[in-house]
Amino acid sequence: MYGLINIGFGNVVAGDRVIAIVNPESSPLKRMKDEAKLEGKLIDATYGRKTRSIIITDSNHIILSAIQPETIAQRFMENFYEIERVLRETKK
């Protein structure tokens, strides 16, 4: 239950669909990105900037972001805590 997460430049991803947020520098991730492109499952949300993170979804889509993985992870946690806070308040 994470809601929508901002991944940069006005782009958002459904938090509940994300499996991993990783650094794109390793060879296996570069191959995964190339395979996703061939399969039509690559989404480039970098707006021409350097890819700093790769987001892997439960539907095997690969999303490229120009935001650092740590920053996106922090946004996940902020959204999670905000949703939890709202749920606690509505139960009172």
From Swiss-Prot:
InterPro entries: RemA-like (IPR007169)
A Pfam family per the record: RemA-like
Domain of life: Bacteria
Paired cysteines (S-S): none
NCBIfam families given in the database record: PRK04323.1
Family: Belongs to the RemA family.
Protein known as: Putative regulatory protein TM_1690
Organism: Thermotoga maritima (strain ATCC 43589 / DSM 3109 / JCM 10099 / NBRC 100826 / MSB8)
